[in-house]
């Protein structure tokens, strides 16, 4: 099972820290994980030129090419963003918009994957829920199944109060509780997904050699 995590922060700081923590936990539970950080990457905005509709690929040749490959390969996707202006980062927004080139190749290319959201705000109520909703909207548009940690603490995903420092986010016990609860549900859905997929293969006549 492959899990791909995207850190939408332009820095390798608090958002990167909690995403890496999440992926390390999954890795320890037997999942194959990979982290893509927007730090130092060149990913331009979607120009909506419709080149992808005709040529089945994006006209821009930048670091988004790596993201395209990993999005197709993963079973689970974690989107982690700092809260900026009450929403997601411009870096993550560009990645979302540029996914259009994948859909131009195959409308269902991301359908059935499992999605999870992480939002990190400088304030406790700094807009984390709005960031989650944007991530969840992206999941739903592309047929990705969004997973949260459930009611009472992690309704939409893992929410953190960073106070803009690594040392302070490490002290956010409530945030890490929301992360652990969301990861638990994320793992359950991933394992259920692979069970359903494997059962479908067997019914389709697939045989283990």
Model-assigned labels for residue ranges:
Residues 1-106, 152, 156-157, 161-209:
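N-terminal beta1-alpha1-beta2 submodule of the flavodoxin-like/Rossmannoid cofactor-binding fold
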Residues 108-152:
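Short, glycine-/small-residue-rich phosphate/pyrophosphate-handling segment
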């Amino acid at each position: 099972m492959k899990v791909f995590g995207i850190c939408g922060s332009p820095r390798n700081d608090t958002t990167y820290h909690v995403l890496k923590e999440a992926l390390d936990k999954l890795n320890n539970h037997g999942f194959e994980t990979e982290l893509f950080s927007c730090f130092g990457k060149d990913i331009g905005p979607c120009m909506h030129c419709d080149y992808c509709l005709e040529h089945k690929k994006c006209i821009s040749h930048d670091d988004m090419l790596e993201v395209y490959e990993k999005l197709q390969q993963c079973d689970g996707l974690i989107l982690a963003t700092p809260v900026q202006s009450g929403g997601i980062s411009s870096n993550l927004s560009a990645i979302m918009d540029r996914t259009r080139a994948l859909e131009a190749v195959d409308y269902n290319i991301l359908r059935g994957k499992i999605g999870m959201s992480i939002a990190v705000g400088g304030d406790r109520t700094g807009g984390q829920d709005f960031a989650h909703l944007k991530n969840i909207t992206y999941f739903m548009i592309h047929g990705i199944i969004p997973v949260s940690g459930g009611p009472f603490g992690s309704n939409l995903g893992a929410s953190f109060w960073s106070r803009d420092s690594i040392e302070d986010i490490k002290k956010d016990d409530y945030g890490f509780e929301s992360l652990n609860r969301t990861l638990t549900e994320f793992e359950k859905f991933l394992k259920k997904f692979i069970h359903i997929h494997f059962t479908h293969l067997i019914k389709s006549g697939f045989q283990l050699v």
